[in-house]
Amino acid sequence: MAQVINTNSLSLLTQNNLNKSQSALGTAIERLSSGLRINSAKDDAAGQAIANRFTANIKGLTQASRNANDGISIAQTTEGALNEINNNLQRVRELAVQSANSTNSQSDLDSIQAEITQRLNEIDRVSGQTQFNGVKVLAQDNTLTIQVGANDGETIDIDLKQINSQTLGLDTLNVQQKYKVSDTAATVTGYADTTIALDNSTFKASATGLGGTDQKIDGDLKFDDTTGKYYAKVTVTGGTGKDGYYEVSVDKTNGEVTLAGGATSPLTGGLPATATEDVKNVQVANADLTEAKAALTAAGVTGTASVVKMSYTDNNGKTIDGGLAVKVGDDYYSATQNKDGSISINTTKYTADDGTSKTALNKLGGADGKTEVVSIGGKTYAASKAEGHNFKAQPDLAEAAATTTENPLQKIDAALAQVDTLRSDLGAVQNRFNSAITNLGNTVNNLTSARSRIEDSDYATEVSNMSRAQILQQAGTSVLAQANQVPQNVLSLLR
């Protein structure tokens, strides 16, 4: 080897090896400090790609496991609501069994039907209001797709069904029996303006009253809506201490006013606070059907209208007072008598399917013949259910039963079977979700282990590599110092 000064090849060789050991030491320290064998693609390009795919799968499967747990929660929420519906159905069945006993009177059946109706209403409420995260789970047929995998198409479906009294076939369930309906002409009396003026009129009290002296009404009669009594402020001619408010009687045939009960002294407490209605003129008034006829005409009902007194007779011969009604042909419309003797037909206000506010006339009918019902869109509903109902927002409303339900227990059993079927499906899908969660957990564990073998550092190997690199660094540094001294040997030739 030539002795040269310009180029120190030994030093260059040593520097190169020192750089290599420095790089190896840096790599070992990086892997030991991060815990990863692959810190960038340069460490292992193929391994980095494989590990990245594993990471995507692991993250996706972990989220899928959470999705499956959400699916279990939805199924549990739905089944909980179905359990409550089932409880109501069991009570309805119990009531139906009770109603089948011939010892029940018709009023007993009315009471039983009242609870059945309330139970069915509660079923409808549970159906319409039960929700999970804003999703109404029993309000309509629906399929919820739960993503339980890391890739497209890896799903489990939850099939939900609309469960209410209508879909269960119980919306017209009725155990009542039809009453025998009868009517009689109604005598309606009211109070209207007449020529019999009572202002400042004088009248004779009974002999047991104020001793036959003249009394004079000073002002208007007062009427108490609460008690149905009349009161008047009376001035007694020639009397002392007898002036004041008295209860008076009004003869409905001629409007004659007399002291009530032979009163001899005015009311101790004065005029009752509830006596607020002014009555200046009194007359027996015949039923005024003007308002009722206008309502019938507006509803498209034609025919002669008359006011009747309704009565209902059950199978045991018991008669129930049905109040007033307006009769047109064979139809009866529930009616109310106003203070002035006018008759108005009871109505139900609702929102139509086009969003407009409308009014329907209350008709007497239903399975018992005396329930107030309304006809809307060709369907018949109980007036109590249709009152205030929004058919645009909620088009489905249970119709009123027109007849007594045949084989009610069979219908209820079919409804229970329908609920049981859906509950079974929900129970099965919960078990399926549990199985999916277990499988997802196992898969995540296996993929995590596989990714670890690819990208995690082997500390035994890396510590050994670091130690080797450190030793090489120390040795290289020492040798480099010696290699740098080689050109100095050439100087000895120049001495």
UniProtKB/Swiss-Prot annotation:
Keywords: Bacterial flagellum, Secreted. Transmembrane segments: none annotated. GO terms for cellular component: bacterial-type flagellum; extracellular space. InterPro entries: Flagellin, Flagellin_C, Flagellin_C_sub2, Flagellin_D3, Flagellin_N, FLIC_barrel. Induction: Inhibited in nutrient-poor medium (at protein level). One of its GO terms (molecular function) is receptor ligand activity. It comes from the Bacteria. It is found in: Secreted; Bacterial flagellum. Belongs to the bacterial flagellin family. Individual Salmonella serotypes usually alternate between the production of 2 antigenic forms of flagella, termed phase 1 and phase 2, each specified by separate structural genes, fliC and fljB. Flagellin is the subunit protein which polymerizes to form the filaments of bacterial flagella. This is Flagellin. It comes from Salmonella typhimurium (strain LT2 / SGSC1412 / ATCC 700720). The lineage of its organism: Bacteria, Pseudomonadati, Pseudomonadota, Gammaproteobacteria, Enterobacterales.
